[in-house]
Curated annotation (Swiss-Prot):
Organism encoding this protein: Oenothera argillicola
EC top class named in words: transferase
Residues given in the record as Mg(2+) binding sites: D489, D491, D493
Chief place of localization: plastid
Top-rank lineage group of the source organism: Eukaryota
Residues involved in Zn(2+) binding: C69, C71, C87, C90
Subunit note: In plastids the minimal PEP RNA polymerase catalytic core is composed of four subunits: alpha, beta, beta', and beta''. When a (nuclear-encoded) sigma factor is associated with the core the holoenzyme is formed, which can initiate transcription.
SMART domains, sorted: RPOLA_N
Cellular location(s): Plastid, Chloroplast
Cofactors: Mg(2+); Zn(2+)
Family matches, as SUPFAM superfamilies: beta and beta-prime subunits of DNA dependent RNA-polymerase (SSF64484)
Official protein name in the record: DNA-directed RNA polymerase subunit beta'
């Protein structure tokens, strides 16, 4: 629907018969109202033109060719000089043929038909509101049962005679055989009610607010009851309480959306626009038709037969009328959801007909494939790989993708800087990939964010904004901390890239969708940018030390593995673990391949009173000739003078630990500086 502010929106729900009639009916310039489809025909076999009042009627749905009526007369669309703007002979308006994409029709049902989605889908909304078993309602809808109808303050014949002990009774072999069509109609209108009309009467008589009040009272009474000690009874009470909660929620939803319960029973059946259920002529003259057309034909055939029985024939047994009403109900069920009640209806080639539910649901349905999953301009797709050097808000975009996505902006940049005379020259430079093109591309991308999306987009963090930079290769580089929001990993996952074009879209992406602006989960409030998967494995390897376990990382003078520090250049074995005065020397030795990433080493460290004051006994004490001595512990060494004063200390660590500590220290210092600037 389109509101008064011209905002296009879609709302799915039940509508009244009056609303369906308003959508489908249109008044021709001669005052004639058209919109009802009464014939089950599509095209005439001789003229190949749509049948009048059929499923493809041009009077109802509009002309097949713009400005050409069914007679072949041509008029200019929108020309006010030509009057009238429709053909008086065939009744077709001279309008654009695109009207056949949205102009609806309707079928006036001879008897009400229950919407199978509200009856058979679990939980059943109709059974919930009426508080009756689903099997009894199904028997009522499909004319297997009926109930006695009480007339206001007047006893009915059936209740006086006591034929119906309960409200629901079988009538198949007792009542309708004794009445003709006219007599049975009179009898049914006063005494009994059956079919979808009975459901509609009960739904129309509901007061939703009374249902809410009664359900709340019953729920409180059940909550006050103590446990009976019988497990079966306790479960029964629990299920009843859950049912009452669902009933209250459903009634509140109907009140909030201004939907009447009786709208779940159809009196007018909408007919889709013809362009949404086309008939296509293949090579060789063979016609291919949508399954929806055949299902509509079944409904119209059976509905017309029932209408003839009710209006023309006066001697038809009531059983035949009830049987035909059941056939109409089953035809409507098949149209809406084929196979939901029984075995699905098949065509001559034993192929199941695709009903309306099959057309719109699933991955290949109308919404997910055509509306949500359709191809988008200025977008690309590629595999994601880790970008360990990227900031959190940046992503690496392959040159091949970037030059295509930003081609329009790139052409404008080349022309503005007088590097190309026109669009043709700019495209030629882009095609030849001249060096100046990459410089202009970097300038264009510098302030233009891109959107990365990973399907399925189940929550807000499934699509985020990044500042792109050019990278080599054909894969998108991504910071590993943003993977949790996307639920992605680097085992072959793909992501789509979208370029926001308008200034409004770019502003929204920069203010609301940037990855560094979405650090917390919108659902739970927990941190979402936390190390996972690859980062955890990398941190473990970086800080694991000895691969044989954490206990072997302690200094042990009797463990020869403590002295096995291999120098890769000359393959010599050093007898002592190396000592370094600062972290820069240790990292330099690692870059020169003198030590491994997990090789134990001794690093001179600032004095830590918490370590010194501990009561740990040294493993070994080494004395030097000048009187100084070294107290060697499991993870540190204290160097003391002759007077037992502490001169300095060394800690036992690895290059991996040093690298992690430096990164954490820089991050904390940067955070403190940012906090100081803000304060």
């Amino acid at each position: 629907m389109i509101d008064r502010y011209k905002h296009q929106q879609l709302r799915i729900g039940s509508v009244s018969p009056q609303q369906i009639s308003t959508w489908a009916n249109k008044i021709l310039p001669n005052g004639e109202i058209v919109g009802e489809v009464t014939k089950p025909y599509t095209f005439h076999y001789k003229t190949n033109k749509p049948e009048r009042d059929g499923l493809f009627c041009e009077r109802i749905f509009g002309p097949i060719k713009s400005g050409i009526c069914a007679c072949g007369t041509y008029r200019v669309i929108g020309d006010k000089k030509e009057d009238p703007n429709f053909c008086e002979q065939c009744g077709v308006e001279f309008v654009d043929s695109r009207i056949r994409r949205y102009q609806m029709g309707y079928i006036k049902l001879a008897c009400p038909a229950t919407h199978v989605w509200y009856l058979k889908r679990l939980p059943s909304y109709i059974a919930n509101l009426l508080d009756k078993p689903l099997k009894e309602l199904e028997g009522l809808v499909y004319c297997d049962f009926s109930f006695a109808r009480p007339v206001a303050k007047k006893p009915t014949f059936l209740r006086l005679r006591g034929l119906f002990e309960y409200e629901i009774q079988s009538w198949k072999y007792s009542i309708p055989l004794f009445f003709t069509t006219q007599g049975f109609d009179t009898f049914r209108n006063r005494e009994i009610s059956t079919g979808a009309g009975a459901i509609r009467e009960q739904l129309a008589g509901l007061d939703l607010r009374v249902i809410i009040d009664y359900s709340l009272v019953e729920w409180k009474e059940l909550g006050e009851e103590r446990s009976t000690g019988n497990e079966w009874e306790d479960r029964k009470i629990g299920r009843r309480k859950q049912f009452l909660v669902r009933r209250v929620e459903l009634a509140k939803h109907f009140i909030r959306t201004n939907i009447e319960p009786e709208w779940m029973v159809l009196c007018l059946l909408p007919v889709l626009p013809p362009e949404l259920r086309p008939i296509i002529q293949m090579d060789g003259g063979k016609l291919m038709s949508s399954d929806i057309n055949e299902l509509y034909r079944r409904v119209i055939y059976r509905n017309n037969i029932l209408a003839d029985l009710l209006t023309t024939s006066r001697s038809t047994p009531g059983d035949l009328v009830m049987g035909q009403e059941k056939l109409v109900q089953e035809a409507v069920d098949t149209l809406l959801d084929n196979g939901i009640r029984s075995r699905p209806v098949r065509d001559g080639q034993n192929k199941v007909y695709k009903s309306f539910s099959d057309v719109i649901e699933g991955k290949e349905g109308r919404f997910r494939e055509t509306l949500l999953g359709k191809r988008v301009d200025y977008s690309g797709r590629s595999v994601i790989v880790v970008g360990p050097t990227l900031p959190l808000h940046r992503c690496g975009l392959p040159r091949e993708i970037a030059i295509e996505l930003f081609q329009t902006f790139l052409i404008r940049g080349l022309i503005r800087q007088h590097l190309a005379s026109d669009i043709v020259g700019a495209k030629s430079q882009i095609r030849e990939k001249e060096p100046i093109v990459w410089e202009i591309l970097q300038q264009v991308m510098q302030g233009h964010p891109v959107l990365l999306n990973r399907a399925p987009t189940l929550h807000r963090l499934g699509i985020q904004a990044f500042q792109p930079i050019l990278v080599e290769g054909r894969a998108i580089c991504l910071h590993p901390l943003v993977c949790k929001g996307f639920n992605a990993d680097f085992d072959g996952d793909q992501m789509a890239v979208h370029v926001p074009l308008s200034l409004e879209a770019q502003t929204e992406a920069r203010l609301l969708m940037f990855s560094h602006m979405n650090l917390l989960s919108p659902a739970m409030g927990d941190p979402i940018s936390v190390p996972t998967q690859d980062m955890l494995i990398g941190l473990y390897i970086l800080t694991s030390g000895n691969p044989r376990g954490i206990c072997t990382n302690r200094y042990n003078p009797w463990n020869r593995s403590n002295y096995q520090n291999e120098r890769i250049s000359d393959n010599n074995w050093k007898k002592k673990e190396p000592f370094f005065c600062n972290s820069y020397d240790a990292i330099g030795a690692y870059r020169q391949k003198r030590i491994h990433l997990d090789s134990p080493l001794w690093l001179r460290w600032r004095l830590d009173q918490r370590v010194i004051a501990s009561r740990e006994v040294p493993i070994e004490v080494q004395y030097e000739s000048l009187g100084t001595y070294h107290e060697i512990y499991g993870h540190y060494i204290i160097v003391r003078s002759v007077k037992t004063e502490i001169l300095w200390m060394y800690i036992r660590t690895t290059v991996g630990h040093i690298s992690l500590f430096r990164e954490m220290e820089e991050a904390i210092q940067g955070f403190c500086r940012a906090r100081w600037y803000l304060s």
